[in-house]
A protein has these predicted regions:
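A short beta-strand-loop structural module common to alpha/beta enzyme folds
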Residues: 7-19
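Anionic-ligand binding patches
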Residues: 22-166
């Protein structure tokens, strides 16, 4: 965010996330819920929700080490999609978009998966991994920052459109 905005604050929303529907719709609806939950008079809010989809299943953040291991097992050796829904809420409008990137995991054995989870503790990451760790991902297509969790290039374009950044 520092490469887009000079000043910002991070606020944790209290909104309850939805988890039923198409992955791009879920990510977008959750971003809108987060933005509305955090909105205060006169503020500009940028909210994002990122999730992973593979073989018809949606993977958010794991709640336990065991669920992180299970998620990575299911993604191992496969292509999957990373969807980030973004809502930019200004005092007079909401601008929303969804960014999709594709990721191919390395084919990992159980020992590699357990070692990864123990070393990186990815409990705060959709799909139980961080591409920036450089361990589990074989290749990707699309915006690297989107896979990290915020599609910075598209966000910058939206902020320019609404005359919030130069």
């Amino acid at each position: 965010m520092h490469n887009i905005l000079e000043e910002f604050a991070i606020i944790s929303p209290n909104s309850e996330e939805i988890d039923v529907g198409e992955p791009e719709d879920i990510a977008l609806q959750n971003a809108v819920l987060k933005a509305r939950d955090c909105a205060k008079e006169g503020d500009i809010i940028i909210a994002c929700d990122t999730l992973v989809a593979c073989d018809g299943k949606i993977y958010g953040k794991p709640y336990t080490i065991e669920s992180a291991i299970d998620m990575i097992k299911k993604l191992s050796g496969k292509w999957h999609s990373v969807f980030s829904g973004v809502c930019v809420k200004t005092p007079d409008k909401e601008v929303t978009f969804v960014e999709e990137s594709k990721v191919k995991f390395n084919d990992l054995n159980e020992e590699q998966i357990i070692d990864y989870v123990k070393k990186y503790l990815p409990l705060d990451k959709a799909g139980s991994y961080g591409i920036q760790d450089g361990v589990v991902v074989e290749k990707y297509l699309g915006d690297f920052d989107n896979i990290v969790g915020l599609p910075v290039k598209k966000l910058r374009d939206v902020l320019k459109e609404i005359s919030y950044v130069k």
